[in-house]
Amino acid sequence: MPKCEANGHHKIIINKEAPNVPFYTPVQDPPAGTSYDVQPEGSLFSLIKIRNLTLQNRIFVSPMCQYSAKDGVMTPWHKQHLGSFAARGPGLIVTEVNAVSPEGRISPEDAGIYDDGQLGPLRDIVDFVHSQGAKIAIQIGHAGRKASTVVPWLDRKNTAF
């Protein structure tokens, strides 16, 4: 076990495991994004409560289309992408849009929430984000007239912006 010298005494330091995750990841205590400054801080790093939801700060990560899903299922890319934000301490992360039907995706590579098989990978992402002290929200939608097309970089002249 690692030991360190603190005020002339040996102190054992143990890295605690984050709960509710099927693999080891250290718990962040206090969570990343917590202000250590004892002087009055701006509201950005203060808690915010919205009904029954309490967020550790007011830093939110907005949704970003990744065009990296397979048959509407989020992949390890999504876990890495969203998890990298979670480890840096925002109060809330919003996933990219998850389509309500296969035809409602912008492209075949968009995430969906219309099949039970899509829930497992999403659950893994949620568990990891929570293990880092952040909250996560899902953006649900239908692409409307832009639905069932290709990713923007494959056909720029026919992409509706």
Question: Each predicted region: which residue ranges?
Answer:
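Flavin-dependent oxidoreductase catalytic cores
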Residues: 1-161
